[in-house]
């Protein structure tokens, strides 16, 4: 029986990202370098991690602008150095398709915390891939946060660990990970996804478990209903294990959380903005897949 190729699905959560910066646009569109946005840096990070597909979770209000900026696919940077020596480099590049999905209306206002955007993105990657073929089912998922800034090239050294089936992977900075609420990338498995869903379902609904004398359930006060929509990253992802038996945990040399003005200002004042400089138009140029039967006219070699 032929072996199935591994499928690492990249998840970039934009929906329900709290806006602490106060800019007149979505926080994911914040520049991290001249002409280089946070969401583009997140896509490039997912590409360095070795993702085969990238799923951007964003609602209809911001999706058109993000899609216009990011496009429908990017290239795997690990293959770029190899392809430049080929006679036709564009034919040797590895393409990574980018998909866009919004939250379901039944989840909005009930469990739509920022962490749930990650869960929803992973579930959509499973549902859509399985609809195509069971051979396309994702093995693992890698989360790339747009508001967590660090050197994406570091991921290239740990591709095998990130893609290893059945084991989680996480980045750590000064002893903290996503389990502490930091926007540090991590990879998780199907079993981890089940645990995340259970944690979200621990949130309250509209009614309490208390039954009244007339047999009806008691309604909770409005401030206590649907508590899952307020769950933080550390609460939802506290059960993921990063140890040598069940996962990997690796340290990074620098990291900035730019979801607030203080963190964003510190990042701009550091020398790290230059390390995270624009990777080149070859990765960020807007591209669309051609329709069936239409020749590929994108022959750019920039």
Q: What is each PLM-predicted segment?
A:
Residues 1-30, 36, 41, 45-54, ...:
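N-terminal nucleotide-binding beta1-loop-alpha1 segment
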Residues 13-15, 59, 146:
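Cofactor-binding loop segments of dinucleotide-utilizing enzymes, especially the Rossmann-like FAD-
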Residues 20, 62-68:
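Short, charged/polar "capping" segments at the starts of alpha-helices
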Residues 35, 58-62:
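Residues in the short beta-alpha loop(s) of Rossmann-like NAD(P)-binding domains
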Residues 54-59, 171:
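Short internal beta-strands
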Residues 66-78:
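Short, aromatic/basic amphipathic alpha-helical patches
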Residues 76, 85-202:
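Conserved beta-loop-beta/alpha segment of the NTase-like Rossmann-fold superfamily
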Residues 134, 150-163, 175-301:
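Catalytic-core segments of class I nucleotidyltransferases/pyrophosphorylases
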């Amino acid at each position: 029986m032929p072996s199935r190729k591994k499928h690492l699905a990249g998840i970039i959560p934009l929906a329900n990202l709290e806006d602490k910066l106060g800019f007149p646009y979505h926080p994911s569109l914040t520049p991290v370098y001249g002409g280089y946005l946070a969401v583009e840096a997140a896509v490039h990070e997912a590409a360095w991690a070795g993702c085969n597909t990238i799923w951007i979770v964003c609602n209809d209000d911001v999706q058109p602008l993000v899609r216009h900026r990011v496009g429908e696919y990017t290239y795997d940077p690990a293959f770029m150095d190899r392809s430049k020596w080929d006679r036709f480099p564009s034919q040797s590049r590895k393409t990574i398709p980018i998909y866009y999905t919004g939250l379901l209306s039944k989840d909005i206002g009930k469990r739509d915390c920022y962490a749930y955007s990650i869960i929803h993105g992973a579930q959509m990657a499973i549902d859509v891939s399985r609809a195509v073929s069971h051979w396309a089912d994702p093995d693992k998922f890698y989360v790339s946060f747009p508001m967590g800034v660090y050197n994406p090239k570091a991921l290239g050294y740990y591709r095998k660990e990130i893609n290893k089936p059945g084991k989680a992977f996480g980045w750590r900075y000064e002893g903290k990970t996503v389990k502490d609420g930091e926007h540090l990338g991590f990879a998780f498995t199907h079993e981890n996804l089940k645990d995340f869903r259970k944690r979200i379902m621990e949130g309250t609904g509209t009614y309490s478990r208390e039954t009244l004398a007339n047999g009806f359930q008691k309604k909770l006060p409005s401030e206590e209903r649907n508590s899952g929509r307020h769950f933080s990253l550390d609460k939802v992802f506290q059960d993921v294990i990063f140890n040598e038996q069940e996962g990997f945990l690796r340290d990074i040399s620098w990291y900035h959380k730019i979801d607030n003005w203080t963190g964003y200002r510190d990042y701009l004042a550091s020398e790290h903005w230059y390390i995270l400089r624009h990777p080149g138009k070859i990765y960020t140029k807007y591209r669309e897949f051609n329709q069936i039967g239409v020749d590929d006219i994108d022959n750019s070699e920039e």
